[in-house]
Amino acid sequence: MKVLVPATTTNLGAGFDVFGLALDLFNEVEFSFDTKETTIESTGKYASDLKDHNLFFEVLRFFERKTGYRVPPVRIKQTCNIPVSSGLGSSAAVIVAALHIANEGTGRNLSREDLMKLAVELEGHPDNVVPAFTGGLVVCYQNGSHLDFEKFEIDLSLTFLVPNFPVCTNEMRKILPEKVPFEDAVFNIKNSCQFLAKIAAGKIKEALKYVGDRLHQNYRINGNKKMKEFVEAILSKNPEYWFVSGSGPSVCSNINDFEGIPYLKDVLKLRVNNRGMIVSE
């Protein structure tokens, strides 16, 4: 059996912890239960960037604790096509894949919504894992254990600049302030509302004019020397729009001139994936 889990980008600038978008780049995970021991093998372009497979094992054990079901031994082989620790949902892809595998191995007792809630509990916020399940542009709401979302199917291509250094999401969250100026909060509300209004009106490309942010990006950029140099070089190209993908360090921008950008490793031109996770026998 095989499951393909898409890369995701979140926040989209103004929609901090709310907006998530699935992309047409997938980690491919093949699995089989005809084994006596759980093993995980990784191949693919970004496999060498993985430090270990602890997250896979952690998710399988988490599933057992939360559901009471025992996951049988499973042989897992993943092809890593999503950059690791780069703000494109590599951890979310592992979480979603591992939960799907655990559910398959225990009789498919949980619905997609049940798995989604477990994924959000593991990840800590919904904007990566929900679009990985559903595809499309997702607007998420979480209040305690209550999760709600709306999905928009959109036709859009985006360019992501991926640097050659990783960042830790948890560390980048610690950089964020406990309080922000009132006018900064209003700025983000205006942009996020106008972004969604353009999406709802079918004016997809116009929506990208409203990704400006004052709540999280500058704090993260200024808190990491390499990331600051990377973003400043991108901004020197005078892009029409840009935003940090997730907590970084990757950046989405419409520039076409990549000369002189330090640390640049990959340029990924990706379309929105409106289907989400793909399962095949």
Swiss-Prot record:
<dbReference type="InterPro" id="IPR020568">
    <property type="entry name" value="Ribosomal_Su5_D2-typ_SF"/>
</dbReference>
<keyword id="KW-0808">Transferase</keyword>
<dbReference type="InterPro" id="IPR000870">
    <property type="entry name" value="Homoserine_kinase"/>
</dbReference>
<keyword id="KW-0963">Cytoplasm</keyword>
<comment type="similarity">
    <text>Belongs to the GHMP kinase family. Homoserine kinase subfamily.</text>
</comment>
<keyword id="KW-0547">Nucleotide-binding</keyword>
<dbReference type="InterPro" id="IPR014721">
    <property type="entry name" value="Ribsml_uS5_D2-typ_fold_subgr"/>
</dbReference>
<dbReference type="InterPro" id="IPR006203">
    <property type="entry name" value="GHMP_knse_ATP-bd_CS"/>
</dbReference>
<keyword id="KW-0028">Amino-acid biosynthesis</keyword>
<comment type="function">
    <text>Catalyzes the ATP-dependent phosphorylation of L-homoserine to L-homoserine phosphate.</text>
</comment>
<feature type="binding site">
    <location>
        <begin position="83"/>
        <end position="93"/>
    </location>
    <ligand>
        <name>ATP</name>
    </ligand>
</feature>
<keyword id="KW-0418">Kinase</keyword>
<dbReference type="GO" id="GO:0009088">
    <property type="term" value="P:threonine biosynthetic process"/>
</dbReference>
<comment type="pathway">
    <text>Amino-acid biosynthesis; L-threonine biosynthesis; L-threonine from L-aspartate: step 4/5.</text>
</comment>
<dbReference type="Pfam" id="PF00288">
    <property type="entry name" value="GHMP_kinases_N"/>
</dbReference>
<dbReference type="GO" id="GO:0005524">
    <property type="term" value="F:ATP binding"/>
</dbReference>
<dbReference type="InterPro" id="IPR006204">
    <property type="entry name" value="GHMP_kinase_N_dom"/>
</dbReference>
<protein>
    <recommendedName>
        <fullName>Homoserine kinase</fullName>
        <ecNumber>2.7.1.39</ecNumber>
    </recommendedName>
</protein>
<dbReference type="InterPro" id="IPR036554">
    <property type="entry name" value="GHMP_kinase_C_sf"/>
</dbReference>
<dbReference type="GO" id="GO:0005737">
    <property type="term" value="C:cytoplasm"/>
</dbReference>
<keyword id="KW-0791">Threonine biosynthesis</keyword>
<keyword id="KW-0067">ATP-binding</keyword>
<dbReference type="GO" id="GO:0004413">
    <property type="term" value="F:homoserine kinase activity"/>
</dbReference>
